[in-house]
Each structure stands twice: as structure tokens, then as C-alpha cells.
Amino acid sequence: LLRAATADDSRAIHRLVISGGINPTGLDWRRFVVAISAQGEVIGCGQVKPHRDGSLELASIAVTPEWRGQGVARAIIERLLAENPGALYLMCRSGLGGLYEKFGFRVIQEDEMPRYFHKISRLAGLVEMLRRDG
């Protein structure tokens, strides 16, 4: 089951993001979609995060280890893309770009990045920057 997150999900979202090794800044539960197990546990999450320069970032995609490989992340990504049909950006660890290319993202160069991502990419190090046109 996928649904919009509620305030009650905020702790579970934070735990998932931290356990996934994802930067926890900007975690506002109101932007999240969560995947819920049959037992009512939050087993996955993701958000589309707006930035001051107007760009939107697909971010914080995380799934509990025991649910990985079962389509949870795919379902979350598909839902977020359907709800946000315009241009989206994302940063991911090098080597994960292929996963997102399946959803229409493509690797971009520095000169194609919005200002926020251009600045943060220098700090992030080994990441790939991708864009999906709406």
C-alpha cells in the first residue's frame, strides 16, 4: 500500500533515510509518500523536494532491507513521478544512475544543473546528477 505520509510517519521516515545512508536534511513528512506493509509498518519512503531556485529533486528514496528487491522503491518512484510530471533532478551514488535511467532520467553535466545542484554537487563528491524532462 502506498499513501501520503502523515505526521505519525515522521520518525519512521527519518530512520529509513538514516539507515539508507541518505542525507537527512530537508525531511518534511508532508512531501513524502510511504509504502506500508500488511502489518501497518512503514517499509519505504520517498519525496520530491523543492529548492529555492525552483528546481525539484526526487530524493530520500529508501526501503527497509528485508523489502528491497520486491518493487517497493519502483512503486514509490512511479507514484512520485506521476504526481510531479515536470522536470525533476536527482543525485545518487555513482553506479546507481542506471536504476533511474529506467524512469527516463539521464546523466547531465555541470552546465545543465540548476544552481542549487551545481553548488551541492561540488560538496557531494562521488555522485551522479540526473534529470528527467517533464
State the predicted function of each range.
Residues 1-24, 34-37, 41:
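Short amphipathic alpha-helix that is part of the acyltransferase structural core
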Residues 63, 69-82:
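Conserved acetyl-CoA-binding loop-helix of GNAT-fold acetyltransferases
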Residues 94-121, 128:
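Conserved active-site alpha-helix within GNAT-family acetyltransferase domains
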